[in-house]
């Protein structure tokens, strides 16, 4: 392996995977360290502030509390935790190659941030499945609030189980007077255990979820873009509802693609290191790792920006959240976006059935009346005149109850 590496299972604090080949304690110029510190500090501030604001927007406003939005809250909390605990502490460890934070936090660092990473990707998968059921199978029963909370709890339990092996084998070692937080895999099968764990993790928290989301959003896209709105409703609620669903799909696809791009180089880095350990002898590898780790962690700060750019309600929520800033001036319309319950249209037919063209309380980040659609009550509206023996009657406008 060469004298350039530490022959221990040094975890240079990936927060997800361990570099068990070890890394030399390369020093860097002060100016370079300052640049990296600024980049990581900006990442943490944007990610924590943005995801905390997203959580507040949804939980503080009754209109926003929908099934899909609960998964968005779960995603935001996971990203917030990953940025706060993973990015900040691991940057210090990776840049100094010394563990300053004690044994207990070593165990914590190899459990909770990794769990948050798993929760993040599984929350995106849950959103994709929820939208698939709402749009492709609109008449199937939707998740209730208790069921949604149970699914979220299950996501955290599965994530904890997947993160536990790295926590279980974590320990503190001393190397030439420097304290290390390492993952000490069983010595008799160290290389095999490491590679197997890397591959299992990549499959379970990257390839498999991305495949599920790709299939789900592909079917959703085909369903929505093939759906035609009847000519007499071309300017009505049905059209707005359909456009809102399309916008939601575009938003979530952008979220997923951003996540995939940010994490792919990081996973490839560790796979390559499992086969070619000598790459860790190169002087530039510390800079490569810091760059790839920053790119991976930056995935935690993009979602709030995407929501704010593509969704009217989130823009209103951000204006309200930052109204103390002199350059932010929320309007009365911003308050109504988050508190006012819109009207919806009912179409009554001879069969005494109702067609709900637009329902209040639809989810974000899809948009309908003023840009929103797709919540727990979100069902595909049905053209009643197409049902046997039924003919649509006059449209009746009714106010939705809050």
Swiss-Prot record:
The keyword Transmembrane applies. Residues 365-402 are annotated as: Disordered. One of its GO terms (cellular component) is plasma membrane. A lipid is attached at residue 324 (S-palmitoyl cysteine). Its main location: membrane. The chain crosses the membrane at residues 33-56, 70-90, 108-129, 150-170, 197-218, 252-272, 291-310. Glycans are attached at residues 11, 19. Keywords: Cell membrane, Disulfide bond, G-protein coupled receptor, Glycoprotein, Lipoprotein, Membrane, Palmitate, Receptor, Transducer, Transmembrane, Transmembrane helix. Disulfide bonds join 106-181. It is a multi-pass membrane protein. It is found in: Cell membrane. This is a receptor for the tachykinin neuropeptide substance K (neurokinin A). It is associated with G proteins that activate a phosphatidylinositol-calcium second messenger system. Belongs to the G-protein coupled receptor 1 family. This is Substance-K receptor. It comes from Cavia porcellus. The gene is TACR2.
